[in-house]
Amino acid sequence: MCKDTYFSGEAIQLSDMLRAREERALRQLHLLKEYPEGSLLSVTMNIPGPIKTSPKLLEAFDIVIKAIQTALADDKICYQLRLLPTTGYEYYLITSLPSQDLKLKMIALETDLPIGRLMDLDVLVLSNGRPSPISRTTLGAPPRQCFICSKEAKVCGRLRKHSVEEMQTAISKLLHSFFNKDNQSSSSDKTG
């Protein structure tokens, strides 16, 4: 397993990332105002370091998007947008499903899908005129765990407990295991 397989994209600068976050917040605000009766799902990947994109990361992203669409197959989807900037992949979806129900489905997906923990599946609502994510903990779900040490992810992030190198290695191992397991089950499906 080579880390370069997963982190082979174009490196970005901090200024690029800050601009992308600003644009994402404006896009989220626009969508919440344009679809006031719908629920907004905003999907990005948790990829540390200056390289946010690669063919394998895109493959993982698209697998999760497909899983989201499958999970919401019985619900009306009013709008979808998939963006592939070098600052990280983005996906937006508006559904008629109530926001809290949508968040519960996304928590289940993050938990059930082995690579779900690499994603931010944010369900956003307007709060004081700004997009605000619904917290997992307000719905009774535990905080997300760090994929390196299993402690609370936000605490590890805030304290910068793990190096970018450590996190990229852990992500590479997770993706390698996921893709190899997926290939093995595909092979056994064909022979079975």
UniProtKB/Swiss-Prot annotation:
Annotated signal sequence range: none
GO molecular function, one term: holo-citrate lyase synthase activity
Catalytic reaction annotation: apo-[citrate lyase ACP] + 2'-(5''-triphospho-alpha-D-ribosyl)-3'-dephospho-CoA = holo-[citrate lyase ACP] + diphosphate
UniProt keyword annotations, A-Z: Nucleotidyltransferase, Transferase
Keyword Protease recorded: no
EC number(s) reported in the record: 2.7.7.61
Designated name of the protein: Probable apo-citrate lyase phosphoribosyl-dephospho-CoA transferase
